[in-house]
Design a protein with these regions (language model features):
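Sec-dependent N-terminal signal peptides
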Residues: 3-14
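Positively charged n-region of N-terminal signal peptides that target proteins for export
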Residues: 1-4, 20
Length: 170
């Protein structure tokens, strides 16, 4: 019972704080994508992020795919100059599986943990590192002249993001 009470306390501490209601505009580089994003901290401990951009596949590394999505972030440790948080990720990926001839799309859920450092003194710049796991598998049909075969696309499971943001108070 103590663990549940502690978890509830951690989830809701600081939800009414005005001091850290911030919005950040920035960019994110990951293993297979580059995305502009908007991160909104509604309190010291709760945030949301919306992103979208170009992506690639593990097999070809060509930036010919697209992805859009969101993150729900919950800080587990907060200091004046950094945050440690966990998050839930949901994204939709549009994939060119055989060049431009065959396309498919799939939802990809994930979880992550991140650390963000920021400076209030110099235009509120922020830098974050995120590490996590995502899962997405899609089976699709491929038409080859007279034959139709089934292929499977699997999303790369590792989330490794580096992000840079410019924050301002809301």
């Amino acid at each position: 019972m103590r663990i549940i009470s502690l978890l509830i306390l951690l989830l809701f501490i600081g939800t009414g704080s005005f001091a850290q209601k911030m919005i950040g505009y920035g960019g994110e580089l990951s293993v297979l994508s580059a995305k502009p994003n908007v991160r909104i901290w509604t309190s010291k401990t709760t945030g949301f992020e919306f992103f979208g951009g170009i992506a690639a596949e593990v097999g070809d590394f060509k930036p010919n795919d697209m992805e859009i999505g969101f993150k729900y972030l919950k800080a587990i440790m907060y200091n004046r100059t950094d945050r440690t948080y966990f998050g839930l990720v949901g994204k939709w990926k549009m994939v060119n599986v055989y060049g431009e001839t065959q396309k498919t799309s799939l939802p990809i859920p994930g979880i992550l943990i991140g650390k963000e450092w920021y400076s209030k003194r110099i235009n509120r710049k922020g830098f974050a590192i995120e590490l996590g796991y995502q899962y997405g598998v899609k089976e699709f049909n491929v038409q080859n002249h007279l034959l139709q075969t089934k292929e499977t696309f699997e999303e790369f499971p590792l989330i490794l993001n580096l992000r840079y943001s410019f924050y301002k108070k809301r």
